Amino acid sequence: MTREPSFIVTIDDERHELFALADGVITLDAIRAHLDEERAAGALAYRELIDARGATPALSPADLRELIALLRGDALFARHGPTAIVVGTEDAFATMRTLALVLADVITLRVFRDFAEAVDWLAAMPAPTPGPLRPPTWH
């Protein structure tokens, strides 16, 4: 029996921080819903700590390509804040590390096995600059 995916999110608007507890089998649809929640809250640019030690990513190569395209598309119009993801398995570490490397030019994303290291790294990140980069110009 597979556990349903879930993200329990706490947003601190004063500190511009977001904490997400991910659990269950995490699919592309679950990630999409999480990003939609961040967008709706105006929190894309916030520092984000994702505790995914209890989660299992279920992302096919096609899902990863779609997620990369989605995040790159977001980056055209809004900043993503620095994101620390804490994982519980080597497979999850490898998957998320690959994602971090591919997106390094648009998102500051780092993967950890140790929660305290993730917290320290995120605390050292510069304060986020919320809001859009600039309106798109079409010629």
What are these regions (language model features)?
Residues 1-139:
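Amphipathic, Lys/Arg-enriched alpha-helical "gate/interface" segment within cytosolic domains
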